[in-house]
Amino acid sequence: MAEPVGKRGRWSGGSGAGRGGRGGWGGRGRRPRAQRSPSRGTLDVVSVDLVTDSDEEILEVATARGAADEVEVEPPEPPGPVASRDNSNSDSEGEDRRPAGPPREPVRRRRRLVLDPGEAPLVPVYSGKVKSSLRLIPDDLSLLKLYPPGDEEEAELADSSGLYHEGSPSPGSPWKTKLRTKDKEEKKKTEFLDLDNSPLSPPSPRTKSRTHTRALKKLSEVNKRLQDLRSCLSPKPPQGQEQQGQEDEVVLVEGPTLPETPRLFPLKIRCRADLVRLPLRMSEPLQSVVDHMATHLGVSPSRILLLFGETELSPTATPRTLKLGVADIIDCVVLTSSPEATETSQQLQLRVQGKEKHQTLEVSLSRDSPLKTLMSHYEEAMGLSGRKLSFFFDGTKLSGRELPADLGMESGDLIEVWG
């Protein structure tokens, strides 16, 4: 049976020199490339499986067959029974080019793009505006060197002293704080590792002393700023007061004791149709009221009777003991003369007034008795025995030998005493 002539097309070179070439190898292998003509360059279709990281693709790569081809020839398959030529009536050209044996597994290779650093293209990440406003920091330079911890401490001091205004920007930004905290955490980790390696070694006191001194320094600076602020706000004292304050300090324990002015109580006295107001101290006895009303009415004080409601008041009582108020009114009654009073009409009621207001004494004396009796009685009553006293009546000094009848004395007359 004659072999069918293969179709010549665009890839006709891939079919070899014809069907008869296959019998020379005793199988379906291709003719060795050494037998091909070096002057004739042909194209063959080789199935190469390029596997990428994402998915698998099978690409057909056209390779030039020639004398300089570096692709090695696949080892020939073992000889086998030649397929019948009659069955290739309607097969495609692929069957002529490919053996009819079991399908070969495609060569799987991974696509790897290896470029030199000089061949890699440089693509700008940021635009021109971003680059102009962005200051990049070199990789070999630490961020904390650009921003020392002193700036953060000054910012904390400014916040604590309140010197920054509300509208002014804060001296520290959040990313600086994050970087510093990150650096501190790394330092703490290294310290913890050192402590784990040497558990018996106590912590160095240098860190404690540094923090203590730093805190003291901050406190002193804050106090200094507060003092400066206080000096600016407080008025400047006069120079004389400042020198006096530097020399000595005067502490006023208590203020000067002012003399207490007696509180006068306006006592209302009703006599017949008249209402008399007499200023009186709360601790003063009512005897002064009796004397004032006897003088006002022209009668003997023994005839004056004071009543509060229906209660007779004693001359020794005081407004405080009686609990009298401003609205209370005392009644004054003048007693009539009795027959006993006519019998004792020879007795004179003389008033003796000393230098002080409270040194007042009323003495009963007959008209025929010398005034020496009155003088001795007054000295004993006032406790002035042994003192030199002078008694005057109407401007005349009394010697004590005078009689009241000789001087024309009457009841209620006043004798003055001077020491």
Curated annotation (Swiss-Prot):
Biased composition regions of type Basic and acidic residues, renumbered to the chain: 180-192
Modification comment: Methylation at the N-terminus by PRMT1 modulates interaction with the NFAT complex and results in augmented cytokine production.
Entry-annotated residues carrying Phosphothreonine: T316, T318
Compartments reported by the entry: Nucleus; Cytoplasm
Record keywords, A-Z: Coiled coil, Cytoplasm, Isopeptide bond, Methylation, Nucleus, Phosphoprotein, Ubl conjugation
Record-listed cross-link Glycyl lysine isopeptide (Lys-Gly) (interchain with G-Cter in SUMO2), residues: K129, K131
SUPFAM superfamilies: Ubiquitin-like (SSF54236)
Entry coiled-coil feature ranges: 209-231
UniProt KW Cell membrane keyword: no
Gene3D superfamilies xrefs: Phosphatidylinositol 3-kinase Catalytic Subunit, Chain A, domain 1
Bilayer-spanning residue ranges: none
Highest taxon listed in the record's lineage: Eukaryota
Domain Ubiquitin-like: start-end pairs: 348-419
Modified residues (Phosphoserine): S54, S84, S88, S90, S92, S127, S198, S201, S204, S220, S314, S369, S390
Gly residues bias (residue ranges): 11-27
Listed Low complexity bias regions: 35-51
Region called Disordered, residue ranges: 1-131, 151-215
Main localization of the protein described in the UniProt heading: nucleus
PANTHER family: NFATC2-INTERACTING PROTEIN (PTHR47187:SF1)
Subunit structure: Interacts with NFATC2, TRAF1, TRAF2 and PRMT1. Interacts with UBE2I/UBC9.
Stated role: In T-helper 2 (Th2) cells, regulates the magnitude of NFAT-driven transcription of a specific subset of cytokine genes, including IL3, IL4, IL5 and IL13, but not IL2. Recruits PRMT1 to the IL4 promoter; this leads to enhancement of histone H4 'Arg-3'-methylation and facilitates subsequent histone acetylation at the IL4 locus, thus promotes robust cytokine expression. Down-regulates formation of poly-SUMO chains by UBE2I/UBC9.
Protein name (database record): NFATC2-interacting protein
